[in-house]
Amino acid sequence: MQKKPTSAYVHIPFCTQICYYCDFSKVFIKNQPVDSYLEHLLEEFRFYDIQKLRTLYIGGGTPTALSAPQLEVLLKGLTKNLDLSVLEELTIEANPGDLDADKIAVLKNSAVNRVSLGVQTFDDKMLKKIGRSHLEKDIYENIDRLKLAGFDNISIDLIYALPDQTMDQVKENVAKAIGLDIPHMSLYSLILENHTVFMNRMRRGKLPLPKEELEAEMFEYIIAELEKAGFEHYEISNFSKIGFESRHNLMYWDNAEYYGIGAGASGYVNGVRYKNHGPIRHYLSAVEEGNARITEEYLSQKEQMEEEMFLGLRKKSGVSMARFEEKFGRSFDELYGEIVRDLVQKGLMQIEGDRVRMTKRGLFLGDTVAERFILE
């Protein structure tokens, strides 16, 4: 009997605007079959007969692009058969400017206990430049409303190294973020993805991005300021006050299995990584036929070990060598000892007791270091 995952990701692909940097599975909400989508999504959720989850994460797209009644249908449908005494964290992503009093009332009356706001930047001109429709004032209004409704576990996403962004603008953003008095932040450098407005502009030479040295300086400044303000840098892009780490995201970095529900969602169940149909009408038909998945990949032990390292090294706490050996029945030193010693010598990794982890410099070079753990 295989152990069932205790986490699920639920994808709501609708947006009220399409941001210039985003390549996630999403569509503009107008004229979309939203109610039918929610029915099919809940049908897919029921198919897995999920009764116990530790973490549930509703992302997008923009879940709060749904109307208050639609949000209620979604939240009630997802939690109806769940044992809520086991559910530690139910996060919903929200857009500043989308969260009116009715939607907050729905969240308050549901099992949601964590809200993640896509702030991106506090600069109104920059918000317009990156295709966001909210304003700085909406951020403060939404956070005040959420706090008034009793939500204390609030997170924001910020992006740095944006087009034409200066160090002073980053400093101002960080100061404003700290001033919100919330316990969690995710900070990402702008990554150019294919099929986005920004990638098309860059290819035409029309996207003035900060140089790599300035981006590194921004990253170092962000870490130093947030640590000074009492945040722990617990994962490459994530900072939290003690006890407010994102349990759902820690589950990903611990390389645990999870259900992926909804159009374009990815999941990892019984050693199989899968992806669902992305286009909404394809997804609806696939659910009706009894299988929402479009791709499935069985991971070999080699691939599982590589993923254990790639994901685990994103965390400040790194990877436990004993847990690795217990999970895979292989000697960590035989597989990775030489590589780790080389990276320690280069100042990119350190060994602390049973754990191997990245240094600050290693964290900045993240993927370059992780690539060393691909097994030949």
Regions found by a protein language model. Give the residues of each.
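Local cysteine-cluster metal-coordination motifs and their immediate loop/turn environment
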Residues: 13-26
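C-terminal scaffold of the Radical SAM
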Residues: 3-5, 26-48, 52-330
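Short amphipathic alpha-helical interaction segments
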Residues: 329-344
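Minor-groove-contacting beta-hairpin "wing" of winged helix-turn-helix DNA-binding domains
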Residues: 355-359
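Conserved N-terminal Rossmann-fold NAD(P)-binding element of oxidoreductases
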Residues: 10
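A short, conserved structural fragment
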Residues: 344-354
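Short, amphipathic alpha-helical interaction segments positioned at domain boundaries
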Residues: 361-376
